[in-house]
């Protein structure tokens, strides 16, 4: 499963749009909070098992499941360090990390399955060597003075600030198994693009409209979007799906029995979906004064 979140404006305030998606299902919802409070309130990801692909947000790491980190994020950070912080002048470890990740991806794609243990060990050794080179060039800053000194104005309290390179290297070392999960576990992708794509259309909508004026409007929009995105993944005709809602014969998604999709802490299943979805779409059309297309005009679309 893939999970991600992005900021949106609802009722003039910052909210967070959360998504949980698979190859065949999409679920989106907005909440004022970004982390675990939103997961609990929305019923999102609380019981997820298997592998969860995400971008490394701390709240995701607290979930009791196997984790895989998005390497597109890592590559972007490594490119920045290589090009903007003059790392290429001194050592070149960041560029070599990028090349090693891409090489691993190519080998996994060519094999169509996790790599043999000997190749995994080779990549592990290369990764360890690059981490050591990077850490030699970007050592962690150590606290100077004592807490008593800080109270007297000497030194600073709390964790010492680190460079972007040092922070990235620490994360890549601490979560190295999650970085290389795509190489060791069957079917785990290299990136979290599936979740980011699920959020993209809603960001475009926000650029056009500016924000959602009410929480109810946001809930309505994301419910409809969840249904249509799911049916699109399952190769259904979306116009037929909408017609089926109004005809009270809703075309049902094919749900994976291992996955529960929840909305407002209520299970979104085959029993509750038709009426819930129909009422939601009707309210959306009424509130936005959308005029139905005459049947004679259907052929034009």
Summary of predicted features, one role per range:
Residues 1-277, 281:
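Catalytic center-proximal scaffold of phosphoryl-transfer enzymes
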Residues 280, 290-292:
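Compositionally biased, low-complexity segments
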Residues 297-300:
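Short, intrinsically disordered C-terminal tails of secreted or membrane-associated proteins
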């Amino acid at each position: 499963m893939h999970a991600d979140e992005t900021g949106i404006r609802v009722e003039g305030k910052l909210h967070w749009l959360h998504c949980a998606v698979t190859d065949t299902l999409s679920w989106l919802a907005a909440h004022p909070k970004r982390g675990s409070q939103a997961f609990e309130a929305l019923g999102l990801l609380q019981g997820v098992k298997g592998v969860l692909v995400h971008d490394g947000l701390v709240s995701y790491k607290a979930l009791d499941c196997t984790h895989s980190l998005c390497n597109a994020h890592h590559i972007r950070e490594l490119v920045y360090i290589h090009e903007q912080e003059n790392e290429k002048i001194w050592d070149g470890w960041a560029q070599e990390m990028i090349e090693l990740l891409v090489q691993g991806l190519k080998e996994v794609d060519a094999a169509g399955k996790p790599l043999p243990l000997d190749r995994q060990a080779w990549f592990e050794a290369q990764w360890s060597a690059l981490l050591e080179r990077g850490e030699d060039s970007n050592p962690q800053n150590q606290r100077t003075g004592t807490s008593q000194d800080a109270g007297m104005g000497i030194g600073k309290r709390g964790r010492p600030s680190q460079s972007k390179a040092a922070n990235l290297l620490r994360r890549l070392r601490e979560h190295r198994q999650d970085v290389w999960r795509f190489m060791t576990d069957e079917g785990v992708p290299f990136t979290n693009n599936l979740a980011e794509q699920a959020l993209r259309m809603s960001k475009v909508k926000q650029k056009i409209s500016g924000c959602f004026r009410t929480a109810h409007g946001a809930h309505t929009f994301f419910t409809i979007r969840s249904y249509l995105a799911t049916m699109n993944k399952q190769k259904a005709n979306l116009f037929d799906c909408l017609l089926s809602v109004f005809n009270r014969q809703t075309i049902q998604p094919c749900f994976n029995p291992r996955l529960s999709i929840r909305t407002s802490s209520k299970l979104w299943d085959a029993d509750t979906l038709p009426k819930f979805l129909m009422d939601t779409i009707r309210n959306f059309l009424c509130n936005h004064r959308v005029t139905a297309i005459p049947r004679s005009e259907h052929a034009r679309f």
